[in-house]
Regions:
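Residue-centric detector for conserved, function-critical "anchor" positions
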Residues: 1-4, 61-66
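Short alpha-helical DNA-recognition segment
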Residues: 21-41
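A general structural motif at alpha-helix termini
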Residues: 33, 44, 72-75
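Short alpha-helix boundary/capping elements
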Residues: 34-37, 48, 64-65
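Short, basic-rich loop-to-helix N-cap that marks the start of a DNA-contacting helix
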Residues: 45-59
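Short, charged recognition helix plus adjacent turn
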Residues: 65-81
């Protein structure tokens, strides 16, 4: 079973890879997510496990690739990105 910390580490690394490997600090990522840096650190270390993250991951795993892209694009629009 995947741990919540694995989800956050995978996503953090994917965002860094998107930026051509340019490191993104935990402080910057926390700011972008609008959470305290300590909270984000705890998520990555597995000290705190937001239940919603695991639930969202499980839901996304139920979708096909094209359905995931559709959902992500909808979320981008809602976030204004």
């Amino acid at each position: 079973m995947i741990e919540t910390s694995d989800i956050f580490n995978l996503l953090h690394n994917a965002v860094e890879a998107k930026n051509i490997g340019k490191k993104i600090s935990q402080a910057k990522m926390a700011e972008d997510l609008d959470v305290p840096m300590r909270t984000y650190q705890d998520w990555r270390l597995g000290n705190s496990k937001p239940q919603a993250a695991a639930a969202v991951c499980k839901l996304l795993c139920e979708l096909d690739d094209d359905e995931i892209l559709f959902v992500v694009n909808k979320m981008r629009k809602l976030l204004g990105k």
